[in-house]
């Protein structure tokens, strides 16, 4: 049995998760503590890196103590941290702390990929992950991935050529005067609207477009132009039409990728995976295509330390070597690089 403590500080959530890796490879969540600084960013309409970094400094100690207490652990066997991608200053806070704990406790340190953590979060709810296609959708990332196992190299099938899906949500939420963060509020508003009242364009869906690539910049512009030309537009209908366009493209391409590759499982992960319409449409299309759909509960979709602990546990189980304590953070770490060693 191996106990893994993991720190997540890539953006505005300070997360500490603790997981247990059993001899049979099973991963069990022991603690998941998160402190968010989102309220400090609201008046700026987005995350301010300096504020996020200072908030991590203040929150990490108390969050660590709560996690250790909840798990009943005094000293883990492994310490892990998000090494990238993310905000440079925010990453430094978590990685520096993790390295210090690793050295003080005399245990191995694993520098792991934040995006891989999103994929690994689902294991807590649905068990070991089979070979699958993964749709990873978050505030700054939109990727289609081929995942053979969480301990094997990840293959990128496609990604966004401009805005990520989560970025589009935040930008359209601002256009509608919904404030920041906009994803959840826009989702709630869209549920009260008519998603067929306004049909917005679906980017990168033409016969000559890359089948697994995404584009949401044009959709955002289309919403802005619609609002300019329709000053009396019903915001709920605009939100519903926008959300339908995003969910349609994401699920259509994800199901196609799984079908093309002959895999039977589709995993959807990342913050946008908490979106109600995306989950609903994915369920419908996976059922029609004979695919098994896996989506973590909403609390596991957003940033947290538990997902980093899970991913680190799978790397340990696969025999990956620890990372050196002088390994640098990598704010632009690509999704296909699971670990920095």
From Swiss-Prot:
Cofactors: Fe(2+)
Positions of substrate binding: 136-140, 170, 183, 187, 275
UniProt subcellular location: Cytoplasm
A Pfam family reported for this protein in Swiss-Prot or TrEMBL: TsaD
Gene3D superfamilies per UniProt: 3.30.420.40
Record gene name: tsaD
SUPFAM superfamilies in UniProt: Actin-like ATPase domain
Described purpose of this protein according to its UniProt entry: Required for the formation of a threonylcarbamoyl group on adenosine at position 37 (t(6)A37) in tRNAs that read codons beginning with adenine. Is involved in the transfer of the threonylcarbamoyl moiety of threonylcarbamoyl-AMP (TC-AMP) to the N6 group of A37, together with TsaE and TsaB. TsaD likely plays a direct catalytic role in this reaction.
Name of the protein this chain belongs to: tRNA N6-adenosine threonylcarbamoyltransferase
GO cellular component: cytoplasm
Disulphide linkage map: none
PANTHER family, per database record: TRNA N6-ADENOSINE THREONYLCARBAMOYLTRANSFERASE, TRNA N6-ADENOSINE THREONYLCARBAMOYLTRANSFERASE, MITOCHONDRIAL
UniProt KW Acyltransferase keyword: yes
Note describing how the cofactor binds: Binds 1 Fe(2+) ion per subunit.
MF terms (GO), sorted A to Z: iron ion binding; N(6)-L-threonylcarbamoyladenine synthase activity
Keywords for this protein: Acyltransferase, Cytoplasm, Iron, Metal-binding, Transferase, tRNA processing
Main location, first listed in the record: cytoplasm
Residues annotated to bind Fe cation: 114, 118, 303
GO biological process: tRNA threonylcarbamoyladenosine modification
Annotated catalysed reactions: L-threonylcarbamoyladenylate + adenosine(37) in tRNA = N(6)-L-threonylcarbamoyladenosine(37) in tRNA + AMP + H(+)
């Amino acid at each position: 049995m191996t106990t893994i403590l993991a720190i997540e500080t890539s953006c505005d959530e300070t997360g500490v998760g603790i997981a247990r890796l059993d001899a049979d490879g099973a991963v069990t969540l022991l603690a998941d503590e998160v402190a968010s600084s989102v309220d400090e960013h609201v008046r700026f309409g987005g995350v301010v890196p300096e504020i996020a970094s200072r908030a991590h400094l203040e929150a990490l100690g108390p969050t660590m103590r709560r996690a250790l207490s909840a798990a009943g652990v005094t000293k883990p066997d492994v310490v892990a941290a998000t090494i990238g991608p993310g905000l440079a200053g925010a990453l430094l806070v978590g990685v520096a702390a993790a390295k210090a704990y690793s050295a003080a406790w005399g245990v191995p340190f694993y520098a792991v990929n934040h995006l891989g953590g999103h994929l690994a979060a689902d294991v807590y709810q649905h068990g070991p992950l089979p070979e699958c296609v993964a749709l990873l959708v978050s505030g700054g990332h939109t990727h289609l991935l081929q995942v053979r196992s969480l301990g094997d190299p990840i293959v990128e099938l496609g990604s966004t050529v401009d805005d990520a899906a989560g970025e589009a949500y935040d930008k359209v939420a601002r256009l509608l005067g919904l404030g920041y963060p906009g994803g959840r509020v826009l989702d709630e508003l869209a549920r009260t609207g008519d998603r067929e009242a306004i049909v917005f364009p679906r980017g990168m869906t033409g016969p000559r477009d890359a089948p697994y690539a995404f584009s949401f910049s044009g959709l955002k512009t289309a919403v802005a132009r619609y609002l300019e030309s329709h000053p009396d537009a019903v915001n709920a209908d605009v939100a519903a039409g926008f959300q339908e366009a995003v969910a349609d493209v994401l699920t259509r391409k994800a199901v196609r990728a799984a079908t093309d590759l002959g895999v039977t499982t589709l995993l959807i992960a990342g913050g946008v995976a908490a979106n109600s319409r995306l989950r609903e449409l994915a369920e419908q299309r996976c059922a029609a295509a004979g695919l098994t759909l896996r989506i973590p509960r909403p609390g596991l979709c957003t940033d947290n330390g538990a997902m980093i602990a899970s991913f680190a546990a799978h790397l340990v189980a696969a025999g990956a070597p620890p990372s050196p304590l002088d390994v640098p953070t990598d704010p632009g770490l690509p999704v296909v690089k699971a670990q920095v060693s």
